[in-house]
Amino acid sequence: MIGLVLAAGAGSRLAPFTDALPKTLLPVDGERSILDVAIANLKHVGLDEIAVVIGFAADRIAERAPELERRHGVRLELVYNPKAEEWNNAYSLWCAREAFAEGALLVNGDTVHPASVEERLLASRGEELVIAVDQEKPLGDEEMKIHLTEEQLLGRIHKDVDPAGAHGEYIGLTLIEPEAAAPLADALEATWQRDPSLYYEDGFQEFADRGGRIGIASIGTVEWVEVDDHADLERAREVACRC
């Protein structure tokens, strides 16, 4: 099993900081970037082989890779997404299908959280995929919400899930077991071929609709933030200094 970080996005709502810099490289704790936090968390749970999907301003991450390897004691594999500025992240994750073929712990490259989330995921192994879910946070219309089946498996994942009936928010971390790799890659391919603007969570829905089993790991009362805009970045800096 490897660590896998999706870091191909541009982060247009964080301009001008991201005009020529991937948002995953934005500093959140001194010189530590969002990507530093993600790599450190994966290393903390014993994953020192890490693939990073790059796209927008890919050269900036490639330039930083040797320093990141030295700092964290890991080996990085860079996976290039040539459509990162045109298509959404269902294609981005599909680009990493060879990297996650033997299983992976997937982390969104714009999420700041403590390593306890990775620990929870690894402690919750059992299904083909396991997604990290915040079941404490009040939900609105913009969150990537989930609804569970009677078996406590993922039934639906989408922003349009009714907040009143939702069972939590997916926070951007997933454990992919080796046996799920090929069917997940197929589901992701079907998803981006249907509509390249779709998210990888739509690929998860396709995987579940085909009979794939997706469990959850409830993260408990944990501070985390998905960095989409300047307000998120300020909050990420508060969270990162406590990670």
Annotate each predicted stretch with a short phrase.
Residues 69-144:
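Conserved beta-loop-beta/alpha segment of the NTase-like Rossmann-fold superfamily
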Residues 1-3, 167-243:
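Conserved alpha/beta core of the MobA/IspD/sugar-nucleotide pyrophosphorylase nucleotidyltransferase superfamily
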Residues 25, 146-148, 216:
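A structural signal for short hydrophobic beta-strand segments in well-ordered beta-sheet cores
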Residues 114-193:
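Conserved core of the sugar-phosphate nucleotidyltransferase
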Residues 20-36:
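Short catalytic helix/loop segments, enriched in acidic residues and glycine
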Residues 24, 75-77, 153, 213-215:
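Conserved beta-strand segments of alpha/beta enzyme cores
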Residues 1-19, 26:
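N-terminal nucleotide-binding beta1-loop-alpha1 segment
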Residues 2-5, 32-103, 194:
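Conserved N-terminal catalytic core of the sugar/cofactor nucleotidyltransferase
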